[in-house]
Structure formats: C-alpha cells, structure tokens
C-alpha cells in the first residue's frame, strides 16, 4: 500500500474525547480499499487536534472515499465539535514499508518538513542511505515517511513512535552524536519544520 491520506481535525476545547467516540464508528464506514492505519490525539504542540491516517489500495479507492465523505452530511459525526478539517494526500517513500499495526508507542511524533523546490529527490536519497542505521539496534523504529502530492509542495511527513518522551530525547540525542542522523545533505533542502506529539485513540491500529 503506497497511497495515504492524513486528515487533521481541529476541535473545540474539551470536545476531543466525545469526538473520538463518534469517529470510532464513522471511520468504519469507509469504502472498500480504505484502511485505517492510525488515529491519534495531540498531546504536545497544537492541542485539540485529532490526526487520522488511512491507506488506500489505489488512487481510485482514495478518490471514491474522498468524494463519499465530502458529499455526505456530517460524514464523521463530529461536525458539532469541529473548527477545521485538513485533508492531505501522501505517497510512501519507495524504499520503506510501514510498521505493522500493534504497540509501538504510545507517543507518536508527526514531523512535517517543507522543502525548497528541488529538495525532494536529495531528501529521499539521504533518507534511503541513513534510515537503516537510524532505525537499527540501539536507536528506534520509524513508522514510515511520505511525500505530499497536493497542497504546499514539496513537503514530506515522517512518523516516529516512542515508548516515552525520555526515550525520544535519548535516541535523538545519541543519533546526532553518533553521526547516524540527520540524513546527509538534508539541511540545505529544508524551509520549515513542524512537529506534534500524539497519543493513540483506544481503537487506533497503531498503539
């Protein structure tokens, strides 16, 4: 599965818990060819956000599901709580396979980087070389990395699970000190960097 969609819901204060109850049911109504990968609630960063990551069999399935929920009345059952909904299309980096569903967190860091116009190819080349050592013994796994195919481009998203915030700090510090991360030539490609830490919903396949 190479095609993905990230939906970010921004909700009214003190409504996310109730919204998740509705999403547990409405996300199951997706069309065939759409698979829920993860559903998370923001913990550090911009609060009151729910991120939903879904994978698709092909572009036809992704477009069919997009049209379904855009045309349905209150498709996700949370319109009363919603301040904003952002939908983004992503394609998996060709040399990566996402982690299988299961317990990898509970902290999931979603990092989004905006790149210079010609920055995607050298970014992926650097990742292909460096991601093996960075995710090897003594460091930590990456869920996956994706490049955007709509909106403000080029940009990419990478998702990192951690058992604790202490583990995150330890691994990131050692990876830099050991010279295994960040990827070679990645800095000159960057324009902006954004990061949010999330915790999984009870029904999220990624915990």
Located regions from the model:
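Glycine-rich beta-strand-turn "strand-cap" elements at beta-sheet edges
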Residues: 1-2, 10, 35-51, 71-107, ...
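Helix N-cap motif at beta-to-alpha junctions
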Residues: 15, 55-61, 116-120, 161-167
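Short amphipathic alpha-helical segments
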Residues: 15-36, 67-78, 119-144, 175-185
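Short cationic/low-complexity microdomains
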Residues: 165-179
